[in-house]
Amino acid sequence: MARVTAEDCNKIIPDRFRLVVLATRYAKLLNYKVETSYSKKEKRDKPPVIALRRIAAGKVSVAQLEQDLINSLCTRNIIEPLANQDDLEDVEEKFDYLPEVYVGEDYSDLDDQIFIDENGEYDERDK
C-alpha cells in the first residue's frame, strides 16, 4: 500500500492546517457520494486517503474546495424584518405571558415568588 504523506500534499497546499481542513471537506464529499468517479485503485481506499491522494496529484481544485467549504459554513437563514404593524403586534402578544421576575444579588427575592406546576395550579415552593 502506498502511503500519502503530508509532504506530497504540501507542494499543493503549503499550510498543514489548511490542508487538513480542505482534505477533510473533500473526504466528507466523497463519503456522501457527491463525487462518485473512483479509479480501480481507489475503490478499496477510504475517503480521507482518496482525498489526500487527489490533492497531492493536483486533481482537485483547491479554490473550488475552499469556496465549497465557505458556502457550507455560511448561514442560510435570513431573518426578514417585520413589514407592518399587525405583524409586530402578533409577535408582542406571543410574549405577553412572560412574567416579570426581579432577582436580587442574593436571590432572596425568589422566596416570595409563586410558581405554577405542570397542571397549571399555583405551587408555593418550600423555603
UniProtKB/Swiss-Prot annotation:
The keyword Transferase applies. Gene3D superfamilies: 3.90.940.10. It is an enzyme of class 2 (transferase). This is DNA-directed RNA polymerase subunit omega. Keywords: DNA-directed RNA polymerase, Nucleotidyltransferase, Transcription, Transferase. InterPro entries: DNA-dir_RNA_pol_omega, Pol_omega/Rpo6/RPB6, RPB6/omega-like_sf. The lineage of its organism: Bacteria, Pseudomonadati, Pseudomonadota, Alphaproteobacteria, Rickettsiales. Promotes RNA polymerase assembly. Latches the N- and C-terminal regions of the beta' subunit thereby facilitating its interaction with the beta and alpha subunits. GO terms for molecular function: DNA binding; DNA-directed RNA polymerase activity. It comes from the Bacteria. GO terms for cellular component: DNA-directed RNA polymerase complex. GO terms for biological process: DNA-templated transcription. Its EC number is 2.7.7.6. It catalyses: RNA(n) + a ribonucleoside 5'-triphosphate = RNA(n+1) + diphosphate. Belongs to the RNA polymerase subunit omega family. The RNAP catalytic core consists of 2 alpha, 1 beta, 1 beta' and 1 omega subunit. When a sigma factor is associated with the core the holoenzyme is formed, which can initiate transcription.
